[in-house]
Each structure stands twice: as C-alpha cells, then as structure tokens.
Amino acid sequence: MAVISMKQLLEAGVHFGHQTRRWNPKMARYIFTERNGIYIIDLQKTVRKVEEAYNYVRNLAADGGTVLFVGTKKQAQESVKEEAERCGMYYVNERWLGGMMTNFQTIQKRVSRLRELEKMEAEGVFEVLPKKEVAALRHEMEKLERFLGGIKSMKKLPDALFVVDPRKERIAVAEARRLNIPIVGIVDTNCDPDEIDVVIPANDDAIRAVKLLTGRIADAIIEGQQGSDEAEEAEEAAEEVVAE
C-alpha cells in the first residue's frame, strides 16, 4: 500500500508553493507549473519523496534511532508537538535556542534545572516558600517548560532531524549540518533543498499539509519501533528454543 496518495496531498493543499517572485531556483526540479503567480509543486515527486522519507525514518526507528521534530512557525507548532508525542520522540515547537545541539551540555543543565523545579513543586516545597519566591520559580519553570519541554527526556543528540520549513529553522539546520546529523524536511518553493538530506517538496504554510506530512513521519517511526519490538521478541524466542 502506498504511504500517501495524490488525493490526500491535493485535499491538504500540499501542491501550493509560494508566489513566483519568492522562490529559490534550486527548487525548480520539484515545480510542476505556475498558476496565477503561484508555483504548483509536482505532487508525483512529492509522493516519491514522502515514501523515501518514510522508509528512511522507519529504518532509523527500527534500529533504535531517535528523531527530533522541529517546527516553530504557527502553522506547525501543534502538529509537531502532537505527532512527536504520539510516536514517543522529541520536539522543539516554540523557539530554537542557539546551541540546542552544538552546545548540548549547557542546554542539558537548563533541562536539569527544569526537572529540579518540577520535583520541588511535586514534593510540596513551593507550599512552604514565600509567595513572591514561588511566583518567580513558577515563572522560571513555565519558561523552561515552554522552550525545553519537548526535549526534557532527550539524553543525547538525536540521530536525525525532521524540520518543517528549513528556511525558518535555519539555525537548527546549520547546527545539524555541523554535527553531521541527517535532516528530513518539508521544503517549500522558497527554500534551499541542498541543505536537506531527504527533501519532501510541499506547502509548509498550510496547517492541513503540515499535519498530514508530519503525521506520516510519526507513522513511520511507530512502524519502525513495532518492527524492532517484534524482531526482539523473535530473537528472545529463538534463544529460549536453543536453551531448551
């Protein structure tokens, strides 16, 4: 069965690119035509590229790999959080803090501080502190949760990035490239596809389009994880047979 259909892509408006004056010539190979001053993305290519991205991410997850979902623009925030949580992966959907990967140890210290504050609240420490101090601590905790909540359980650098709009997330893309972390991305007609390892040519401004494609990436991860679990169970069963 196909990973995604042309009908689904059309219904979600995946084919609508940017205005012709706002384009990157490197995206020409993914453009089908121009209509009313807007580029139309070649959905046959999108179908193939979604399949390529799906297989790549599924295999990565089957090998125990992790993916960091990145999408901080309004149209992507909700989908990125929901789909990353659904497949048990990490996400950044508010603001990419410079050095999130290239200065990972420092970011981990901020995550530790977030955990410390959460523990204080859970253990009732806030209840015995002065109101003014509690208000300041809560404010700090909420701010840390907002920016780092999606990577709270990420103990090491991810094995891949999934990015919605690499142009908007250029700092994340630059950090991943510097660290040789592969990038899968939803790439619109105004982006540079050369910076992305697995390009999904698509509209990155429509909520439905972003939701559809982000959901497929999450599906691939879940499928990979299930395959990994089944392989583990088969291995354990084989070991038991040998032991008998």
Swiss-Prot record:
Xref: InterPro entries: Ribosomal_uS2, Ribosomal_uS2_bac/mit/plastid, Ribosomal_uS2_CS, Ribosomal_uS2_flav_dom_sf
Q: What residues form the membrane-spanning segments?
A: none
- Could you tell me one molecular function GO term of this UniProt entry? structural constituent of ribosome
Gene3D superfamilies per UniProt: Glucose-6-phosphate isomerase like protein, domain 1, Helix hairpin bin
> Which Pfam families would you find in this protein's record?
Ribosomal_S2 (PF00318)
Give start-end positions of Acidic residues composition bias: 229-244
Source domain of life is Bacteria
Q: Where is this region: Disordered?
A: 224-244
A single Gene Ontology CC annotation of this entry is:
cytosolic small ribosomal subunit
Keyword check for Lipid biosynthesis, yes or no: no
Alphabetically list the UniProt keywords. Ribonucleoprotein, Ribosomal protein
Its BP terms in the Gene Ontology are: translation
What the record says about family reads: Belongs to the universal ribosomal protein uS2 family.
Write the protein's name.
Small ribosomal subunit protein uS2
Q: Which organism is it from?
A: Desulfitobacterium hafniense (strain Y51)
Q: Which gene encodes it?
A: rpsB
